[in-house]
Amino acid sequence: MKKILLLLLIFVSGCTGVVAQQFDYGKIAPHPRLLLPAGGEEAIRKAIAEYPPLATVHQRIMELCDRTLTEPPVERIKEGKRLLAISRIALKRIYYLSYAYRMTGDKKYAHRAEQEMLAVSRFTDWNPTHFLDVGEMVIGIGYRL
């Protein structure tokens, strides 16, 4: 059984190398592309103007971002065995601040998102004993958003 798994692993690893060599990386859209492609802001602005509930959500996000600007960046403070609450605060802040920057072009939001990412990157760890904490602490979501 071990031999079969080893052979399968060798075969699969060889195939992925071939696929990677054949992939045309020039066809990938430029950044930003993760959640909101370049120019996507205009479609959101139009939807906000046409759909009042969406305008309410947008306004609430902007209010939260403005409030975040007055608060200190997140700190590594565990609750019992968990860092999950802090992870979720960081994720929410980075996501919302990135959105605010893209929608307004105001660099204060981008700078603050960067501060939040730097703050979590300085944590001694992301609580690897609880994988959900680590998963929630994905700061790449803010990168080039």
Language-model regions: role of each:
Residues 10-11, 26, 95:
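N-terminal hydrophobic alpha-helix used for membrane targeting or insertion
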Residues 22-30:
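N-terminal low-complexity, Pro/Thr/Ser-rich intrinsically disordered segments
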Residues 12-15, 78:
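Intrinsically disordered, low-complexity segments enriched in small/polar residues
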Residues 33-49, 53-145:
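Aromatic-lined, polymer-binding surfaces characteristic
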Residues 4-13:
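Sec-dependent N-terminal signal peptides
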Residues 18-20:
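Boundary at the C-terminal end of the N-terminal hydrophobic targeting segment
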